[in-house]
């Protein structure tokens, strides 16, 4: 199969979807790998490293899309890429269709096959291609939240962990999955007073068994969340419904319950966001204020640490990329229902129910 790796062009997206080691694996199996010029440079990989393992370098993104049977990316195609995607071309990446109608319609028009990292499942029903970036995003959400609590960044001027004789900041984490767990552990490690909410009592029991003593668990309800808001300094939204739009757990009227300068970090923004007042931001302009509350809603948080996140991502995606290249998408999906769950759009038709439901469409 001919595999194409375009350079990511989303704002400050520094990851690359295939490392030289991954390219080597594909080339050794008889596949042809084309890499766009400097696609790996921000993750620490030169064109020469790719060429040494048998990959070929192409000068432009148009060249890569034109020749490849399978495109492997990190983030969804953006508007200038829509017309480059071809009929029957397999595109393997994070899509997050449920919060982006324009992208969804563009991929339907293209007639391509869209296989989304975020809905591929394993035998236990887990999300193996979402986990590594959720781990990175969870940890970074605490780091970024702590940064924007600082006075020069517009925050209230609070040190997350406090010091002896001074109380630490209070952190509220909404969602006890991979993102929320990593966010809570990072905040706890810095010494914050942490509360983590979830709607699953079994999950809360699990969390209470291994979380440090400065982490409390709380059943997630509007009433319980509202009670926490007046004393909380940093709120991290880490809600996930696979492939679907995130629910709004904090509404605009609830902002009035918070202290001015409270920081909201919405990690669910790539699925529409779990705060009513959220809209996507970029690493170049990461924050904005609503009613005196700081919102951090960067949709590609791991893109800021590409030397870590590229390796974490490709460790997970490479086995699937190899299977798709070896077998083709139809046979790969036939052999593994988990891969089939990754199919969101096939030849112009939505095949993933949560995406159709997000727009009120029928499959």
Where do the language-model regions lie?
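Glycine-rich phosphate/diphosphate-binding loop of Rossmann-like nucleotide-binding domains
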Residues: 6-45, 152-240, 287
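Glycine/serine-rich phosphate-binding loop and adjoining beta1-alpha1 elements at the start
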Residues: 2, 8, 79-169, 298-300
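Rossmann-like adenosine-cofactor binding region
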Residues: 209-291
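Adenosine-phosphate binding glycine-rich loop
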Residues: 118-144, 148-159, 269, 274-363
């Amino acid at each position: 199969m001919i595999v194409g790796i375009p350079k990511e062009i989303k704002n400050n997206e520094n990851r690359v979807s295939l490392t030289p080691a991954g390219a080597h694996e594909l080339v050794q199996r008889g596949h042809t790998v084309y890499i766009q010029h400097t696609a790996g440079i921000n993750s620490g990989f030169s064109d020469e490293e790719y060429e040494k393992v048998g990959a070929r370098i192409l000068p432009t993104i148009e060249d890569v899309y034109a020749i490849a049977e399978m495109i492997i990316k990190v983030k969804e195609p953006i508007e200038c890429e829509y017309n480059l995607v071809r009929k029957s071309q397999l595109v393997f990446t994070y899509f997050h269709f449920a919060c982006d109608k324009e992208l969804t319609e563009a991929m339907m028009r293209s007639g391509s096959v869209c296989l989304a990292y975020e809905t591929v499942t394993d035998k236990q029903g887990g999300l193996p291609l979402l986990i590594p970036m959720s781990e990175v995003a969870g940890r970074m959400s605490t780091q970024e939240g702590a940064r924007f609590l600082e006075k020069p960044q517009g925050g209230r001027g609070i040190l997350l962990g406090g010091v002896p004789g001074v109380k630490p900041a209070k952190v509220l984490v909404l969602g006890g999955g991979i993102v929320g767990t990593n966010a809570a552990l990072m905040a706890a490690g810095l010494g914050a007073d942490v509360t983590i909410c979830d709607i699953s009592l079994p999950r809360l029991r699990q969390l209470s068994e291994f979380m440090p003593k400065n982490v409390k668990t709380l059943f997630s309800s509007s009433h319980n969340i509202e009670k926490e808001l007046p004393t909380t300094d940093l709120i991290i939204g880490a809600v996930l419904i696979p492939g679907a739009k995130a629910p709004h757990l904090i509404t605009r009227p609830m902002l009035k319950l918070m202290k001015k300068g409270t920081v909201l970090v919405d990690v669910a923004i790539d699925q529409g966001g779990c705060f009513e007042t959220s809209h996507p931001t970029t690493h170049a302009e990461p924050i904005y204020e609503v009613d005196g509350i700081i919102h951090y809603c960067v949709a590609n948080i791991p893109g800021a640490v590409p030397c870590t996140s590229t390796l974490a991502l490709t460790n997970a995606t490479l086995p699937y990329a190899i299977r798709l290249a070896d077998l083709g998408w139809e046979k790969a999906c036939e052999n593994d229902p988990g891969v089939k769950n990754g199919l969101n759009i096939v030849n112009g038709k939505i095949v993933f129910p949560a995406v159709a439901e997000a727009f009120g469409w029928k499959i």
